């Protein structure tokens, strides 16, 4: 007998249908100002939050690096001023009708320490127990706790251990809130399928979708070096377009990836098949699913191809009952353009997402 989704996450998942990632605000801060009040006050302003709501999103994924809190305090005594700022942001988002995924989003060295050190693991679990206690007063119908972005932990068994311990302590500190759990590594569909069967029923399970990197991350400097040679790749896959690119690409790995892209014939029907294992896994375990990262790097991707990809992915996720959160609001995958305090919607992206704002 196939289990049914627990009524609490089933209900709450309905406020996670269409969202946007608030990146580079409280995590992955590239500004020279760093994690300072000046950066926090400038990068996302009240006008931005109002704009997100006006565009038609129902939630945001609020990415938060835990390192600044731990450097200014300890796992058991987090800095009161920093926590107060986070709580204030959540209040403002709620006031604009937006649900909030509180996403712990550290840098790679922090995640490496979780892989290697049992002391770091214990500190992280303590951090979540204390942090969840601070957040326990936030409306549980509209506030979700995501344990760790793209864990990249050495060994799936260790990640299952870390995530399981975090769920236990969050549940002690915030018994009513819904938790977002994800697979290891970059939290893609194959990693979702490796997760332990759920024990705590008030959990929504999550994956990220950037396949194939040859298209979504073409020209991105942090991607594998071969991705610098896939600039201009179009979507849906077109053999003639790929042939033109191959004529000017000499990196052997890039040539392999371009040929794979052509042969896979990436298109909406292919993505429906690609999603099928995740959909089946969710039904098998009786859990709600979200995809809280997907997107296309803007700088080198052909505009119409990027719009077509965003439209196909968001539509397919919605049609299959999977809530989605696009990456990102105002970074290099953006739905909004312009500088601090003067941002405006990219209307074509908004419409590609099926929104009317």
Predicted features, each with a name:
Residues 299-357:
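Aromatic-rich peripheral "rim/lid" segments of glycoside hydrolase catalytic domains that contact
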Residues 2-10, 16, 118, 122-267, ...:
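Active-site region of glycoside hydrolase catalytic domains
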Residues 42-46, 272-275, 307-310:
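Structural motif corresponding to alpha-helix initiation and N-cap regions
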Residues 31, 215-219, 328, 336-337:
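Short conserved micro-motifs at the rims of enzyme active sites and ligand-binding pockets
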Residues 100-102, 289, 324:
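Hydrophobic beta-strand scaffold residues
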Residues 5-7, 11-178, 183-191, 202, ...:
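Active-site mouth of glycoside hydrolases
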Residues 36-37, 41, 231-232, 267, ...:
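Gly/Pro-rich active-site loop or hairpin
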Residues 37, 221-223, 304-307:
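Short, surface-exposed loop/helix-turn segments at secondary-structure junctions
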């Amino acid at each position: 007998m196939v289990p049914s989704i627990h009524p609490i996450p089933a209900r709450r998942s309905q406020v996670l249908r269409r969202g946007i990632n608030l990146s580079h605000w409280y995590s992955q801060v590239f500004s020279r100002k760093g994690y300072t009040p000046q950066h926090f006050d400038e990068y996302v302003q009240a006008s931005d939050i109002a704009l997100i709501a006006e565009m038609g999103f129902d939630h945001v994924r609020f990415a938060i690096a835990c390192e600044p809190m731990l450097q200014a305090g300890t796992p058991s005594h987090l800095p009161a001023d920093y926590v107060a700022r986070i709580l204030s942001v959540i209040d403002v988002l709620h006031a604009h009708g937006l649900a909030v995924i509180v996403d712990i989003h550290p840098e790679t060295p922090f995640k490496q320490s979780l892989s290697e050190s049992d002391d770091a693991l214990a500190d992280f679990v303590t951090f979540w127990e204390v942090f969840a206690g601070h957040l326990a007063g936030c409306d549980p119908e509209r506030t979700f706790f995501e344990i760790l972005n793209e864990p990249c932990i050495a060994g799936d068994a260790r990640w299952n251990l870390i995530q399981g311990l975090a769920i236990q302590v969050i549940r002690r500190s915030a018994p009513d809130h819904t938790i977002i759990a994800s697979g290891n590594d970059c939290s893609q569909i194959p990693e979702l399928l490796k997760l332990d069967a759920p024990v705590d029923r008030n959990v929504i399970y999550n994956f990220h979708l950037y396949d194939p990197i040859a298209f979504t991350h073409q020209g991105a400097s942090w991607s594998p070096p071969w991705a610098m040679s896939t600039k201009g790749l179009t979507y849906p896959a077109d053999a003639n377009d790929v042939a033109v690119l191959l004529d000017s690409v000499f990196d052997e790995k890039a040539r392999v990836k371009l040929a794979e892209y052509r042969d896979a014939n990436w298109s909406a029907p292919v993505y429906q098949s690609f999603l099928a294992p995740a959909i089946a896994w969710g039904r098998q375990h009786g859990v709600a699913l979200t995809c809280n990262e997907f997107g296309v790097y803007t700088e080198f991707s052909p505009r119409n191809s990027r719009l077509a990809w965003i439209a196909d992915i968001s539509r397919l996720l919605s049609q299959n009952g999977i809530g989605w959160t696009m990456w990102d609001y105002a970074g290099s995958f953006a739905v909004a353009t312009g500088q601090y305090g003067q941002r405006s919607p990219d209307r074509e992206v908004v419409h590609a997402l099926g929104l009317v704002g």
